[in-house]
Curated annotation (Swiss-Prot):
GO process annotations (BP): photosynthesis
Protein name per its UniProtKB record: Photosystem I reaction center subunit XII
Subcellular localization: Plastid, Chloroplast thylakoid membrane
Membrane topology classification: Single-pass membrane protein
Organism: Phacus acuminatus
Family named by the database record: Belongs to the PsaM family.
Domain of life of the organism encoding this protein: Eukaryota
UniProt keyword list: Chloroplast, Membrane, Photosynthesis, Photosystem I, Plastid, Thylakoid, Transmembrane, Transmembrane helix
Transmembrane feature ranges: 7-26
Gene name in the database record: psaM
Amino acid sequence: MELTTTQIFVELILSLIPATLAFNLGKELTK
């Protein structure tokens, strides 16, 4: 299966969302 640029971009965003949420949560907890 060939990945298009759009699919790669979507996968990248979806993988970054949980990391961003965890990072922000960690910042809130360590205030």
